[in-house]
Amino acid sequence: MMRVHTHTRLCFLCVLTLLYHQCSHCHEGGSHHHHGHNHGDHDHIHSDLQISEMSCNGLSDRLVHGSQGEPAENEQRYYIHQLFCRYGQKDRLDFKGFQSLLLSLGLGEVRVVGLEHEDLGHDHVAHLDILEVQDGRHSHSAGHPHSHQNPNISHKTHQHSHHENEEHTLAEDVPCSKTLGTGATPPSVSEEHDHDHEHDHDHDKDSDHEHNHRHVTDSPQTQDHEHDHIHLHTHSHKQDSDVTQRLELDHDQKSREHAQEHNDLSDQNHHHHDHHHHKHPHPHLHAPESVVHTTSAMPKIQPSVPPELPANQTRRHRRPSKVKAHRGRNRTSVTVTQAVELETSGDDHEHSLQDHSPAQQQRGRREVPGSPAHGVLHQHEECLNLTQLLHQYGLSSDSLISPVQFTYLCPALLYQIDRRFCILHYHHVEAEEQVAPSSGWVWMWGFVSITIISLLSLLGVVLVPILNQSCFKFLLTFLVALAVGTLSGDALLHLLPHSQGDHDHNHGEQMEEEPEVDFLIKFDGVWKGLTALAGIYLLFIIEHCIGMFKHYSDQRGGLCHKKKKGEQAKIGRKLSDHKLNRRSDAEWLHLKPLTEGDGTTCEAGHNDTQMTELQPLDSPSKMPLNISDSDHPYEAPVKTEEDNVPKAKSKKHGHGHGHGHGHGHGHSHHGHCHSDQEMKDAGIASIAWMVIMGDGMHNFSDGLAIGAAFSANITGGISTSVAVFCHELPHELGDFAVLLKAGMSVKQAIVYNLLSALMAYAGMVIGTAVGQYTHNVTSWIFAVTAGMFLYVALVDMLPEMLHGDSEEHKRCEMGHFVLQNFGMLTGFGIMLLIAIFEDHIVLDFGF
């Protein structure tokens, strides 16, 4: 059959005027039209595979009635509607909602399965179920079928039945925007140029050239027209029947003029007319950013052909290269037409590749969203977080995901689920070798950290000149209690939970956010340690209250007894003085010097009149006084009895004064003074050695912990050093206070504190070596350290709080009790805060 291409060109020039007139009326009047415009590739960039939105005013029924993709379209729209209602807002998915969807699917971050689950299998659902058990969201019983879904999503059974218009009727539906459920264009997209023209090209009645293209309503058997252009451009304006009628009249008039100019086309059989591309401008010029969002894109894109194809369907295979070029030219920034063929009609529209202008061919090389831009390959073989996923699709974290964009993202989500990139087993994680820090940096940071912490022992020097004597005693009481609280709190709240493996010190490896876990479950070991501290504190309060009650009852009940006892002591003292005054100086020489043991007893009992009894003057055992036999190294002159009276009184007074101030008087008290000084030195030495050993073990354990942490990670070691510094500050001041209370000078206390601080270097060396050259020993180091801390706190320092200097405590016992409680509670609180927030104490220096 003859084809007249010249007249076809003239026909297109006429249609050009018609389309320009129709387009202007369409935009001004805002009416909906379906134009079956069968022209090929003009200067607009609409894709031939572009699928439009279906509006909510009933046109969707006419468009998809009888279509092969009708069930798929409605099913797709239904499930997208449900997902957007659950995770989206106003028919859009924001970043937070999409993130929740990814986490529900087990995507977006790498998660480690730490439980054995051979009986459950290794499918994706089983892994998600086990991860929920690990997170504490639910637990399994012995006979549990292990078929949970995400507990964060309410289980609802939506029963939907298909009616004639294939609209879903939900039995239980979440209230959502009606526009999405019916397939209408979302509000944010309705502003774009989405045209939905319906033009009936009714030419002259004498002509067989009828353009009545309702491609969707015509069945494939009756469609012999080889036209693949489906321009179903939806427009968001309301339909105006008056404007539509007026446009149809104008259209009929233009069609008649068109038929009169081209009468020779009336004899043509239009069923086999091939529309070739012609170089003429087209009024439908849309910017590349013109996006057609649709929830019904998938139904029109069918991978299979209709059951019955027309006879001229074989034309489709004659020029495959031109068809591919035509499809490749119509890629837009959002619609994906790659490797998809339109099969809803049996028409074919052939374009000549040579007819495309260079500008048109350049526009045809647009990339599909998600394809590598500028030749840069995207990372697909790893677990992608939401930001990476959106970036690969040309979106940002601020973008709102439309239903069409969501359909493009779905293959990536399915691929991530199928390849199991985001779920790993614990043995796979442990098998990955971690890059160990340099040994030089480990040793250097360890020594620097220990040196800074050890210098805290010099901090006590600053406190001595500032405070007076009375305030300093109260400060010492507070610091001792603070040391007890920090030591016992660090052992029970920090070290023991770490030794049990609740969480480790590798802070640098925990920078990524972990899924939220119940606060009580996450710090279960810390709460149990806090309960143990509560038991210690309760018994301390009970024992201290019992001692205070006993002290006050003794003061109240023994007041009269003490007065009576004081009067008897005065009478005895007078009699003793009278007896002593009757003795001469020669008789005083018969007094035996007190032995060291007597001096010790005298020091303990504070008895001023404790002496050896003199022999009576008329005693038969009285021997003549011989000065040479005297044990004294010097000679005493013999005085008269009158001169001896004041001397005896002065001797008695001097002896008593010597006991009160520790000064020796005469030959007899010299031995007692020597014994008291030795005892004092022995007591100081004992306390000093106890502090050196106790505090030294404490510093040694600190060095072990710091060395082990630095050997694992530089950043984690610095964080551990910060935690040690926080409890070493009150502990070193507490030790300084204990040494001062033992009778040491400030200089001696500083020296002993520095000696104990040297043990931290030894601990750091051992901890670093063990951490670098052994495996899984750090937890045992923490356990040993916790035992040492408890011993120092409960055996050495807590008794000092309970049984301190009775004279000082009796003066203001309630004040000391309040300070002790405040110090212990402060220490407990410091260690509790470190135990809870230590993962956030991370100092990243880029190592």
Curated annotation (Swiss-Prot):
<protein>
    <recommendedName>
        <fullName>Zinc transporter ZIP10</fullName>
    </recommendedName>
</protein>
<keyword id="KW-0862">Zinc</keyword>
<dbReference type="GO" id="GO:0030003">
    <property type="term" value="P:intracellular monoatomic cation homeostasis"/>
</dbReference>
<dbReference type="GO" id="GO:0005886">
    <property type="term" value="C:plasma membrane"/>
</dbReference>
<feature type="transmembrane region" description="Helical">
    <location>
        <begin position="779"/>
        <end position="799"/>
    </location>
</feature>
<dbReference type="Pfam" id="PF02535">
    <property type="entry name" value="Zip"/>
</dbReference>
<keyword id="KW-1133">Transmembrane helix</keyword>
<keyword id="KW-0732">Signal</keyword>
<dbReference type="GO" id="GO:0016324">
    <property type="term" value="C:apical plasma membrane"/>
</dbReference>
<feature type="compositionally biased region" description="Basic residues">
    <location>
        <begin position="648"/>
        <end position="672"/>
    </location>
</feature>
<feature type="compositionally biased region" description="Polar residues">
    <location>
        <begin position="179"/>
        <end position="188"/>
    </location>
</feature>
<keyword id="KW-0325">Glycoprotein</keyword>
<feature type="compositionally biased region" description="Basic and acidic residues">
    <location>
        <begin position="162"/>
        <end position="171"/>
    </location>
</feature>
<comment type="similarity">
    <text>Belongs to the ZIP transporter (TC 2.A.5) family.</text>
</comment>
<keyword id="KW-1003">Cell membrane</keyword>
<keyword id="KW-0406">Ion transport</keyword>
<keyword id="KW-0812">Transmembrane</keyword>
<feature type="transmembrane region" description="Helical">
    <location>
        <begin position="529"/>
        <end position="549"/>
    </location>
</feature>
<dbReference type="GO" id="GO:0055113">
    <property type="term" value="P:epiboly involved in gastrulation with mouth forming second"/>
</dbReference>
<dbReference type="InterPro" id="IPR050799">
    <property type="entry name" value="ZIP_Transporter"/>
</dbReference>
<feature type="transmembrane region" description="Helical">
    <location>
        <begin position="817"/>
        <end position="837"/>
    </location>
</feature>
<feature type="transmembrane region" description="Helical">
    <location>
        <begin position="705"/>
        <end position="725"/>
    </location>
</feature>
<feature type="compositionally biased region" description="Basic and acidic residues">
    <location>
        <begin position="190"/>
        <end position="269"/>
    </location>
</feature>
<dbReference type="GO" id="GO:0140410">
    <property type="term" value="F:monoatomic cation:bicarbonate symporter activity"/>
</dbReference>
<feature type="signal peptide">
    <location>
        <begin position="1"/>
        <end position="26"/>
    </location>
</feature>
<keyword id="KW-0472">Membrane</keyword>
<dbReference type="GO" id="GO:0010043">
    <property type="term" value="P:response to zinc ion"/>
</dbReference>
<feature type="transmembrane region" description="Helical">
    <location>
        <begin position="750"/>
        <end position="770"/>
    </location>
</feature>
<dbReference type="GO" id="GO:0071578">
    <property type="term" value="P:zinc ion import across plasma membrane"/>
</dbReference>
<feature type="region of interest" description="Disordered">
    <location>
        <begin position="136"/>
        <end position="374"/>
    </location>
</feature>
<dbReference type="GO" id="GO:0005385">
    <property type="term" value="F:zinc ion transmembrane transporter activity"/>
</dbReference>
<feature type="transmembrane region" description="Helical">
    <location>
        <begin position="474"/>
        <end position="494"/>
    </location>
</feature>
<feature type="region of interest" description="Disordered">
    <location>
        <begin position="613"/>
        <end position="676"/>
    </location>
</feature>
<feature type="compositionally biased region" description="Basic residues">
    <location>
        <begin position="270"/>
        <end position="285"/>
    </location>
</feature>
<feature type="glycosylation site" description="N-linked (GlcNAc...) asparagine">
    <location>
        <position position="385"/>
    </location>
</feature>
<keyword id="KW-0864">Zinc transport</keyword>
<dbReference type="GO" id="GO:0006829">
    <property type="term" value="P:zinc ion transport"/>
</dbReference>
<dbReference type="GO" id="GO:0001837">
    <property type="term" value="P:epithelial to mesenchymal transition"/>
</dbReference>
<comment type="function">
    <text>Zinc-influx transporter. When associated with slc39a6, the heterodimer slc39a10/slc39a6 has a functional role in epithelial-mesenchymal transition (EMT) during embryonic development. Slc39a10/slc39a6 heterodimers play also an essentiel role in initiating mitosis by importing zinc into cells to initiate a pathway resulting in the onset of mitosis. When associated with slc39a6, the heterodimer controls Ncam1 phosphorylation and integration into focal adhesion complexes during EMT.</text>
</comment>
<feature type="compositionally biased region" description="Basic residues">
    <location>
        <begin position="314"/>
        <end position="330"/>
    </location>
</feature>
<dbReference type="InterPro" id="IPR003689">
    <property type="entry name" value="ZIP"/>
</dbReference>
<keyword id="KW-0813">Transport</keyword>
